[in-house]
Amino acid sequence: EYARREEDGFSKAKYSRFNPVQLFLLQSRERALLHLLRKHGITDLSNLSICEIGCGSGGVLQEIQALGASPDKLSGVDLLYPRLLEARFRLPLALLTWADGQSLPFLSNSFDLVLQFTAFSSILSPQVKQAMAAEIMRVLQPHGILISYDFWLNPTNPQTNGIPPKEIAALFPHCVLEFHKITLAPPLARIVVPFSWPLAMMLESLKIFNSHYLVFIQKK
């Protein structure tokens, strides 16, 4: 799915911050992430070791760096090498590795914080998801945190498979989990945002039109 997007010029414009709809979605997600971290007493990322599973071209890690994470404490893995090369150009101090989420090239208990932003939904095999979840738990320190951001339903794309709260809970059975339904469904956002940004924010606040879950998952 990500390889297809990489080759699709229209998709590049669609996911650009110069697209008002994409900007709305990204800023909304960032506000929700900051609120969640603050709620759990995390207001300084500079001393945290952080890894993203499925880091792509580095966009999310750049956002995390902008929030105060130390560039040399960032790590990431991805299977698409061209995207990884772009991430290395953007984040020269980060440790970015061509690797599979089922076999992470890190020691156990390596990270304070792990991120997965729409990696699970791009995996169609339940066994692969389970293996990746186990690896995430392995590399997290005791009481370490996984932040998961993924959609629970995407009926328009057969190359992805939404991951609802019940499935996330099954993947991380011995963890503390907290779910927040966020992100105005992109098809609706594409209609509403160009017409009225405040209306889009109001609709998103209702949650019934939201397509993603932001999940705080803490290892016991």
What name fits each language-model region?
Residues C51, S57-S103:
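Class I SAM-dependent methyltransferase SAM/SAH-binding core
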Residues Q130-P142:
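A short glycine-rich, Lys/Arg-flanked "PGG" loop and its adjoining helix->strand segment in the class I
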Residues E1-S16:
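N-terminal, positively charged/glycine-rich alpha-helical extensions of SAM-dependent methyltransferases
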Residues L26-S46, E63:
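Conserved alpha-helix/loop element of class I SAM-dependent methyltransferases that forms part
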Residues H143-D150:
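Conserved beta-strand signature within the Rossmann-like core of class I S-adenosyl-L-methionine
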Residues Q102-V114:
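A short acidic, Gly/Pro-enriched loop at the edge of an enzyme's catalytic core
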Residues T160-C175, F179-H180:
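Short alpha-helix
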Residues L113-Q127:
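A short SAM/SAH-binding and catalytic strip from SAM-dependent methyltransferases
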